[in-house]
Swiss-Prot record:
GO molecular function annotation: protein phosphatase inhibitor activity; protein serine/threonine phosphatase inhibitor activity
Main localization of the protein described in the UniProt heading: nucleus
Gene, per the UniProt record: mug134
Highest taxon in the source lineage: Eukaryota
Composition bias, Basic and acidic residues: 124-139
Expression induction: Expressed during meiosis.
Protein name according to UniProt: mRNA stability protein mug134
Keyword list, A-Z: Cytoplasm, Nucleus
GO biological process entries: intracellular signal transduction; positive regulation of G2/M transition of mitotic cell cycle involved in cellular response to nitrogen starvation; positive regulation of induction of conjugation with cellular fusion; regulation of mitotic cytokinesis, division site positioning
Functional description taken from the UniProt entry: Plays an essential role in initiation of the G0 program by preventing the degradation of specific nutrient-regulated mRNAs via the 5'-3' mRNA decay pathway.
InterPro entries, per database record: Endosulphine
Family: Belongs to the endosulfine family.
One GO location term (cellular component): nucleus
UniProt-annotated stretches for the region Disordered: 83-139
Species for this entry: Schizosaccharomyces pombe (strain 972 / ATCC 24843)
Amino acid sequence: MVRTRKWMLSTTIIAMSSSNSEQKVDVAKLSPEEQKLFRLYGRLPQRKDLLVQKLQQGRKYFDSGDYALNKAGKASDSGITCIGKEIPSPDTIPHRVVSAGSPNKEPSLHTKRPSESSPSGASSRRESVTRHDLESNEN
């Protein structure tokens, strides 16, 4: 009978809850995980679901701006913008299409200006420089 009494004392433990009221806990009826928690912390965890408890507390805000937007009834940009969702490819980037008769057509970088392409303009410049040099040398 002494053995059974020791066994009963070891399986029925009086635990102190957070409200400091005594509560009898039968360790034999607990699951192995609950027994481990009871041995480590000396009390059983609360039975409330953590996710439900967090949802009931209300939304947590990133900063005061999000809080102010929510109080004002305006949407924050958490679901509206889609920055960084997709890596752009040449097929998905809109390109400007220039028609042949468009007045907004930009000149090509490889075409020469009319003043540079005419050989007569270049030769007349050379002649004026040489005349100037000759006149200055004569004086």
